[in-house]
């Protein structure tokens, strides 16, 4: 039972960190584009990340835990990386490429988390699977802007 609780908390924390990264990245990138269709897609994705993040937070609290989220250093590293990659190129194509790569990394993180925490409850597993499917779908949608 304790093993399942730990796997639940760890898997849900992975969702919190993954969705936090997506949400924070999109909040930084949205103001960089004037492409109306691209911006609409980014806002849609940001809202889904926010929703999944809230669901994971709620589930962690229901398990008696407290979500940690991304560390300040991880947030800073991401922010600086985006700033460097967009310093000279804020084109829709470049932004879409960056986000496509990020979505791919998010999918890999979901797969790893599911393998690392096999004893998690079905609800936690469904949440990470929804996140993975969303990120796979997002990557395909972003490829339209390459």
Predicted features along the sequence, with ranges:
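Amphipathic alpha-helical hairpins
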Residues: 1-146
């Amino acid at each position: 039972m304790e093993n399942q609780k730990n796997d639940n908390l760890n898997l849900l924390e992975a969702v919190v960190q993954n969705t936090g990264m997506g949400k924070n990245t999109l909040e930084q990138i949205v103001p960089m584009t004037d492409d109306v269709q691209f911006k609409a897609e980014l806002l849609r994705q940001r809202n889904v990340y926010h929703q999944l993040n809230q669901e994971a937070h709620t589930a962690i609290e229901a398990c008696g835990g407290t979500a940690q989220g991304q560390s300040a250093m991880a947030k800073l590293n991401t922010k600086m990386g985006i700033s460097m990659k967009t310093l000279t190129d804020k084109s829709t194509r470049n932004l879409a490429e960056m986000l496509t790569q990020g979505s791919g990394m998010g999918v890999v993180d979901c797969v790893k988390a599911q393998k690392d925490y096999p004893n998690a409850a079905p609800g936690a597993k469904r949440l990470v699977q929804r996140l993975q499917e969303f990120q796979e779908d997002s990557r395909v949608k972003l490829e339209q802007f390459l």
